[in-house]
């Protein structure tokens, strides 16, 4: 990292609200860059040094780091923080004219994902594992990388490129309400849903960033009306959905550091789901700042 502002990549959804508050109210000095296609794009940008820090989905980071370690390559980044403690509800969506009516109809179907290695990709394997559809000889689905959320919606409708896709519930709900999509199920992540990754865990600016994010989280909790105004005013969420989401989400009290046990648990589930093998490098190959080491 240079002496310049931190370059922070984030996903432009409601979960980004404390980051915006950290900048607006507490003077976090950062150049922030939105990545609407998700965590797979964040990991690619960490690797090519176009960002210093990324706030993204736990499964996307752990899957990518595990695959990097399996190739015996040095990871370009590691995990340095925990952003959201609560699990993520992934809604399972099909096109509005689809004959699919339940999760059980999805075996061997075409799954649309934002990109290989993204959360939407990884969670399709977690779904397959929970349903007992995993076979060593073949993939449980035909995986179709489509890009951003709009491309996924188009892909199950007019584009007819995929049979279903998975995306965060509240981001998707508007399209159930307007009839564009049909909801056939849901799956929760079996781990805290959002983490923070960085290229250089020794950079002192990360400590300042964590302090400012903690303040942003506290502001978010204490000023829920402003939080709803930000979410509905800058993103495509209704007031009703924003308020409903506020009741379900739990941001970390202190974002600095990662619970090694959480990463171990995530690795074990991703191994069981066929996303990672036993050469994934374990926690040491993924975590740069653990909660036990972060200090006070």
Q: What positions do the PLM features span?
A:
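Pocket-lining segment of extracytoplasmic ligand-binding domains
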Residues: 59, 146-233
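Structured segments of extracytoplasmic/periplasmic soluble domains
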Residues: 45, 64, 109, 127-131, ...
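Eukaryotic N-terminal targeting leaders
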Residues: 1-3, 296
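Proline/Glycine/Serine-rich low-complexity intrinsically disordered segments
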Residues: 97-101, 200, 204, 255
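Predominant activation on well-ordered alpha-helical scaffold segments within soluble catalytic domains
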Residues: 20, 61-62, 93, 125, ...
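Short, glycine-/small- and polar/acidic-enriched structural segments
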Residues: 3-144, 163-169, 183-184, 188
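Secondary-structure end/capping motifs
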Residues: 203-277
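Conserved C-terminal helix/tail region of periplasmic/extracytoplasmic solute-binding proteins
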Residues: 271-296
